[in-house]
Amino acid sequence: DLHPRVRRQRQMCIRDRKKAVRWIRSAAAVAAALVVLLGCFQIFRSLTPRDGQIPMAGAGAAGEAEVSQQQAQSPEDYSRVYAQIKELKEKERENGGDSYTGIYTPALGMDGIPEAGEENAVNTAGGGSPYDGSSAEKDYSDTNNQVEGVQEADIIKTDGEYIYAAVDGDVYLLRENGGNPEILSKIEKIDTVSEEGENICGISERINDIYIAGDRMVLIKYVADYDAYYDMMEDAAETDAAPANGCVIYGPPAGLAKYTAAVYDITDRSHPVLLNELGQSGTLISSRMVGDILYLVYSYYVPGEIDETDPSTYVPALYLGDAKTEVAADDIMLLGEPGAAQYLTVSSIDVGSPAEFLDTQSILGCGSDIYCNSETLVVALTTMEETNDVSKDKTELFRFSLKDGAVTMESQGSVPGYVLNQFSMDEYNGYFRIVTTENVTHYFNEGGIASAEQEKTRNHLFVLDESMNIVGSIEDLARGESIYSARFMGDTGYFVTYRQVDPLFTVDLSTPSEPKILSELKVPGFSNYLHPFGDGLLLGFGQNSDEESGEIQGLKLSMFDTSDPAAVAEKHSELLGKKYMWSNAIGNHKAILVDSEKNLIGFPAENEYMLYSYSPESGFQKIAQLTLEADGPGDMDYDLRGFYVDDVFYLYSPSGLAAFSMEDFSRISTLLWEE
């Protein structure tokens, strides 16, 4: 069985067409979506480099090159792009699909727009922002970033002097003010959507995430323009696609839904000034910021019918303010055998001067997870390798180089198995490391009766070079279990597999061609997240389970002694709360605060926020159990964050912001967003 996180992840590459503002009721439309899903699970084999790019080398499971080096397209020529998209669309129809216009939109929340913070929670490993500014003398926590120097977006940010909070699609800018935060300004979402029965009109916008870089603020937004969809359909009013009252039945297609990065000058926090808004049609897979450069990774499915004379019908749109254009032909690289009419696009923006995109690179394909450091971006896509009688998980890897905003597709490879999340990947000293879980299913047809049999899952670790050739591996580990968390730290890797107990594997990666298992520790439960906690210690956050039945029995903190990698031991553990207690941090690393210097471990537990300290002698100690309001939770907010500025600890909730003294965690103030 797939890990729950991976069930969602596998759908990400087609999520622009899986959900709509209203449930899709067309059987033909559902069939089309299923066809595209299968298409995304096909094998990608070859890439066509654009002018001036280094020819790529690829690797299959055995490390064999899979890349053909064909002539790049000229900037003005979309003919080969059109031909391949046309072929893919025809295959969809042949397999029972229907290019019904207007059913595919990006992944939506319960209210019809994406949930805030979904993309990617507080690196509270201490220290301030990497950006210089007036608050440099302040001591404050940062977002829980995977890679040092690479910022990840979140719903709450601070630079020590100010706090920036995304709340229900809006953004508040506040002066920190020593525990008595003062709202200075508010940026409101645009929402002109109206409903008449099943029909929807207007524009729906939601601010999902925030980046801060000195006096620049970037808001990651989702925008669905239903009116633009109707304008597009006006000339086809005689068809059933355009309702008589001028509204859209199912919502705009992916081509008219977009994610944007709105860049603001916040020199005066009381009056933020919009400098530009840049974006692309489709779904935002993820984003990262390195210095002042923002990198956006998109997936775009081509909806509806296509017209060779109109590239906007089969090429992703780029948005610069109110202007719209298509990705240039010479920025598109053709895959030899993509499974669906879908693009994967990486774009860059200089937030200091956001007049235009610095660079854009697009390939035919899709993605689900990314790993990013200051020089390299790797996009992973879990697919299926299928024959008539066997299907196997496979992860395609696309490696881009990043240099001052220039994005260059360098190499492509693949490994067996599916990837859990971004922490399953890492690059160190020029080598890319990845852990995967593989499902293998055999299909039988005896006497006209079809059946299937799944092998026990197997887990693998692979080391690849910069050409994405496999140079080292450890395969077939922990049969019947799945990877639940991973962390790479220099020459050492840690990963957790689980079925009934939690084996924590420690791997020596100092010789890339010969990785080896140093130790395997089995303890009850499993860690969903691993985080270094000073020298020789590794924190595990996850869930406890019964050793016999495997039944989940609440949350668990573990501290592992890693001072001797060959004899890793669980030094202390702490079981939390009731049997079915849940934490949003289980699936979102940004909801966890870990600061070994301040001896703080924070995370939400249902609708409360827990704070622990750790002692090598006595283990974990609970130091606070916080709620937004003094008389208890009072609401059902689960998407909580904790962060600190100097000696004030803040609890963020979708309902408000509470401040506490870090001396004794007594309440200083409570601010409710609605007041």
Language-model region placement:
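Single conserved hydrophobic/aromatic residue that forms the stacking wall/gate
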Residues: 2-10, 14
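Membrane-interface helical sensory segment of bacterial ECF anti-sigma factor regulators
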Residues: 15-65
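Beta-sheet-rich non-transmembrane sensory/scaffold domains
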Residues: 44-675
